[in-house]
């Protein structure tokens, strides 16, 4: 199996595109971030569950986010086993000042390429998340492994930057107006997604009942990255569109629906426009993000406890009912 990438030129613009055995594929996947921000020992069972659930959701690509850390060999062995392509970023996030000890950084790049280059799942190198590359990084990577594609960061060479990160009216995904940065349902997007409320059981693991309901904004925002995803405001307003809730049980149930509708809409839009089928040319979507590093009020298709949310069910149902039956 030969895996590569190229710039696909179409009447509707140009786009980065994964190629397998010379044929373009639609990259459907998510962004893998640290499994546990508390830095407790990583569990092979947890890693396997996360990657097997990715395949259950019909993903074919996993992006190793440059703002995290390098997974161990077991992660890449599993990607080989499960047929997941790996978009591999190196250890830089948005710091354009670069490390003080650049020689040490390049030594780390060299050891990483040597460790990973024999994995068939490894599809693509990206020097950083959202930063310029350290001088010499590209030449070193290409010298050590000239069989894979390369780009400087996740937002260049026909690849869009991320957004919207917040919940919006689902129709905005269809209308391509969900992001304040402009059109995002075009080409290849490695970082597009929206949060969903975790299960009620996980919410009760996050905070005391007195802060859970009525919603204590200060506490909820603390468990939402300082309110980054607007779970206590915008998300709450979207939930209230289905009627004011009288309990956390009622709010959590409606909150699952809000998250599911957004995830369903996002995947429907990209699926409709994949490759040359729709109104716009889309070659890939990697959902931000794949896994929760801590217990928090902003989950994705599953929460920190690995409990599937309604977003996962609707993603699976978009392609086949069989996968949803397995959950």
Where are the regions that the model predicts?
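Alpha-helical structural signal in soluble globular domains
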Residues: 74, 78-84, 115, 136-144, ...
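Active-site region of glycoside hydrolase catalytic domains
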Residues: 113-217
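Generic beta-strand/beta-sheet core signal
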Residues: 28, 64-65, 87-89, 128, ...
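Substrate-binding clefts and catalytic carboxylate motifs of secreted carbohydrate-active enzymes
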Residues: 176-321
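Flexible loop/turn segments at secondary-structure boundaries
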Residues: 34-37, 69-72, 94-95, 131-134, ...
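Single conserved hydrophobic/aromatic residue that forms the stacking wall/gate
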Residues: 1-9, 319-327
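Active-site-adjacent substrate/metal-binding segments within catalytic domains
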Residues: 5-6, 10-124, 226-260
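Beta-sheet entry/capping signal
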Residues: 60-61, 83-85, 123-124, 147-149, ...
């Amino acid at each position: 199996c030969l895996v590569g990438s190229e710039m696909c030129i179409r009447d509707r613009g140009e786009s980065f595109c994964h190629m397998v055995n010379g044929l373009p594929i639609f990259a459907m996947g998510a962004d893998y971030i640290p499994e546990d921000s508390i830095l407790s020992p990583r569990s092979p069972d947890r890693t396997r569950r996360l990657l097997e659930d990715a395949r259950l959701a019909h993903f074919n690509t996993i992006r190793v986010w440059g703002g995290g850390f390098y997974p161990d060999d077991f992660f890449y062995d599993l990607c080989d086993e499960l047929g997941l392509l790996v978009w591999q970023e190196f250890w830089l996030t948005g710091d354009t000042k670069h490390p003080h000890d650049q020689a040490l950084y390049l030594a780390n790049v060299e050891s990483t390429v040597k460790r990973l280059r024999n994995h068939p799942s490894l599809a693509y190198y990206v020097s950083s998340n959202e930063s310029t590359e350290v001088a010499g990084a590209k030449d070193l990577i290409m010298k050590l492994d000239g069989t894979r594609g390369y780009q400087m960061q996740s937002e260049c060479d026909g690849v869009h930057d991320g957004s919207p990160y917040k919940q919006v009216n689902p129709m905005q995904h269809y209308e391509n107006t969900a992001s304040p940065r402009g059109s995002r349902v075009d080409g290849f997007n490695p970082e597009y997604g929206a949060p969903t409320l975790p299960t009620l059981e996980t919410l009760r693991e996050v905070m005391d009942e007195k802060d859970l309901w009525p919603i204590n904004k200060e506490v909820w925002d603390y468990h939402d990255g300082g309110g980054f995803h607007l779970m206590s405001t915008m998300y709450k307003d979207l939930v209230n569109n289905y009627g004011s809730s009288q309990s956390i049980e009622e709010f959590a149930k409606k909150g699952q629906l809000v998250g599911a509708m957004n995830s369903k809409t996002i995947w429907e839009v990209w699926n409709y426009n994949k490759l040359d089928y729709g109104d716009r040319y889309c070659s890939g979507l990697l959902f931000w993000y794949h896994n929760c590093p801590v217990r928090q009020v902003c989950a994705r298709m599953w929460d920190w406890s690995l409990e599937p949310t309604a977003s996962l069910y609707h993603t699976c149902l978009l392609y086949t009912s069989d996968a949803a039956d397995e959950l």
